[in-house]
Each structure stands twice: as structure tokens, then as C-alpha cells.
């Protein structure tokens, strides 16, 4: 049986919020079977819990923000991407502010935290949503589709009219039956344009943003001294974001997600459309590991 997973131990980290620039304390804790991923604002009294579900997405400007009764947790996508990539079904995420720390702008530090905490299987079947028929959502020239596929695959195309992107690979497909999330996707950093960062700062945002936690691009070039971590790091980060946004389904996905110029808004819009069209998917579990289209390496190997 493919079983649900949680963390073995509690683990803590600190970082800065991308927008506030303030120090944020982060704690990842184990959670019981079927709890899902739940964010907990421990700086509030009483403490507020927000389940990581698509219906709780209240803002997709610049990042994915969960909102419940006016309480927010922003920039959840990179941490959720790490949870999805390592197959964590149940966890409590405590934060001391209204945003998850940006760390280095990728999911890499979160992968390291989860692996350091350890991963344990729980005595219940892992749930998957399997796509049965195609669904496409358009937004102007942008599009996002869910397609039937026996496995999990994300295909993404970006399009920027900018010198840095000319001659670069602007599309990528990652089939997770043959590609390691940890090695090939998790280290891709978020990117931003200098003029946008300056504008955001004038509005009191992006105070924590720097070359330490993003790929920063000016009119002509990449400003980071060390350059890129992958040749196709830009589009790989979009795939990383999509994996995190899709994990707001509350389960792992069996199917393909194909996106053209999509962002957090369209990722969420397509997810809500999928949930609404109940004949387009089915919930499945696997009693027999051998017949499962997605193989999850035994947790011990992930440590």
C-alpha cells in the first residue's frame, strides 16, 4: 500500500519575509492521518489555522496567499512544492508572521528541512486525484490544462520579450517518474526584474528581496554574480511554483499539468475549475505499490 506520510520530528528555521523584510520563525511539525497541510499563525492570539486548500487562496498577486477570516499567510508555494515533491501528506506549518520566509528563493532549503526532520509513513492509504478527462482554462493569451496521464508530469512555457531570455530555453517538461524533484527542480529560484522590484519597494513591498533570494534581472543581464543554477532555471522555477500551487488540491495528482505563460492566479483558477468538474477526476488509493503509476521512494531513502 502507498501510505500517507508526515514528518518524523519537529524542526525549526528562521528567515526573512520577501515583502516585509522582517525575521520570520518557521516550525514544521508532524500531523495525524488525513490532517493535510495546515498553516498556523502563532503570532496571533488566539492562534489561527488555515488549511492549505485551493478554496482558501485569497490573493495571487506576486505569490500565493491563503486567507481565512481576514488572516493571511503569503508565499506558501515554495514550501508546498517541497512538501509535494517529498510526498508529505500531513504537516503543521507554524509561522510567526503573515508570510513564509523566502529563504534562498527556491524550495531547496525546505527540502533540506523536511529531510532533516525525517519522513515517516502513516497507517493509512495515500490519496491521489487522477485526471480522467482534459480541462483547459484560458485567460487572454495564457492557458493551463489538466490532461490524463499515468504518472505526474508538468509542462511549462514562458514568454518574455527581454534580452536575457533570448536564445534561452523557455519551455520544459518534467516527468517525475524519470526526473528527481530534489535534483532537477527544487533549487530553481524565483526571478524578478529590477524595475519591478524598485516599483514594489516604492509601494512598501519586496523589502526582503535581493540577489540572496532571487535571480535579479536588469534591462540587459542577470545581476547575480554566480549566474544560474540550471540553464533553464527561469522556466524550472515556474514548474516549482506550479507544483506548490497544485498541492492546494490537498492530494497528489495523477495526470499532466500543461501551462503557457501561467502564474499563481491562473494556476489557482484552473485548480478551482478542476475541483468543480467532478466528472473530470476521481479519488484513488493504491493497496498494491506495484500498480501505482507514481513511485514514492521509501521515506528512509529521502533522509
Swiss-Prot record:
Q: State which Enzyme Commission number(s) the record gives.
A: 3.5.1.108
**What are the record's GO terms for cellular component?**
membrane
What's one Pfam family here? LpxC
What pathway is this protein a component of? Glycolipid biosynthesis; lipid IV(A) biosynthesis; lipid IV(A) from (3R)-3-hydroxytetradecanoyl-[acyl-carrier-protein] and UDP-N-acetyl-alpha-D-glucosamine: step 2/6
Q: Which domain of life is it from?
A: Bacteria
Cofactor requirements of the protein: Zn(2+)
The cross-references to NCBIfam families, in alphabetical order and at most eight, read:
lpxC
Family designation: Belongs to the LpxC family.
The name under which this protein is listed is UDP-3-O-acyl-N-acetylglucosamine deacetylase
The organism of origin for this protein: Saccharophagus degradans (strain 2-40 / ATCC 43961 / DSM 17024)
Native organism taxonomy: Bacteria, Pseudomonadati, Pseudomonadota, Gammaproteobacteria, Cellvibrionales
Q: Which gene encodes it?
A: lpxC
Amino acid at each position: 500500500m502507498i501510505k500517507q506520510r508526515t514528518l518524523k520530528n519537529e524542526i525549526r528555521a528562521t528567515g526573512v519575509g520577501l515583502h516585509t523584510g522582517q525575521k520570520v520563525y518557521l516550525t514544521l511539525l508532524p500531523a495525524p492521518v488525513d490532517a493535510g497541510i495546515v498553516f498556523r499563525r502563532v503570532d496571533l492570539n488566539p492562534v489561527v489555522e488555515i488549511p492549505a486548500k485551493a478554496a482558501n487562496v485569497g490573493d495571487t498577486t506576486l505569490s500565493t496567499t491563503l486567507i481565512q477570516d481576514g488572516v493571511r499567510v503569503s508565499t506558501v508555494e515554495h514550501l508546498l512544492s517541497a512538501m509535494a515533491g517529498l510526498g508529505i501528506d500531513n504537516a503543521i506549518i507554524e509561522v510567526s508572521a503573515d508570510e513564509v520566509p523566502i529563504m534562498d528563493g527556491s524550495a531547496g532549503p525546505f527540502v533540506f528541512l523536511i529531510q532533516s526532520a525525517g519522513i515517516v509513513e502513516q497507517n493509512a492509504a495515500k490519496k491521489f486525484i487522477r485526471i480522467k478527462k482534459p480541462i483547459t482554462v484560458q485567460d487572454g493569451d495564457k492557458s493551463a490544462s489538466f490532461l490524463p496521464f499515468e504518472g505526474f508530469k508538468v509542462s511549462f512555457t514562458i514568454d518574455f520579450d527581454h534580452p536575457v531570455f533570448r536564445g534561452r530555453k523557455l519551455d520544459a517538461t518534467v516527468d517525475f517518474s524519470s526526473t528527481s524533484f530534489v535534483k532537477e527542480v527544487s533549487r530553481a529560484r524565483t526571478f524578478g526584474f529590477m524595475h519591478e522590484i524598485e516599483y514594489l519597494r516604492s509601494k512598501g513591498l519586496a523589502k526582503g528581496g535581493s540577489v540572496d533570494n532571487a535571480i535579479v534581472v536588469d534591462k540587459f543581464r542577470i545581476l547575480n554574480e554566480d549566474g544560474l543554477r540550471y540553464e533553464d532555471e527561469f522556466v524550472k522555477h515556474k514548474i516549482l511554483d506550479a507544483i506548490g500551487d497544485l498541492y492546494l488540491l490537498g492530494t497528489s495528482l495523477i495526470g499532466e499539468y500543461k501551462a503557457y505563460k501561467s502564474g499563481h492566479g491562473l494556476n489557482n483558477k484552473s485548480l478551482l475549475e478542476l475541483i468543480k468538474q467532478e466528472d473530470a477526476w476521481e479519488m484513488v488509493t493504491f493497496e498494491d505499490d506495484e500498480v501505482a503509476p507514481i513511485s514514492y521512494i521509501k521515506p528512509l531513502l529521502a533522509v
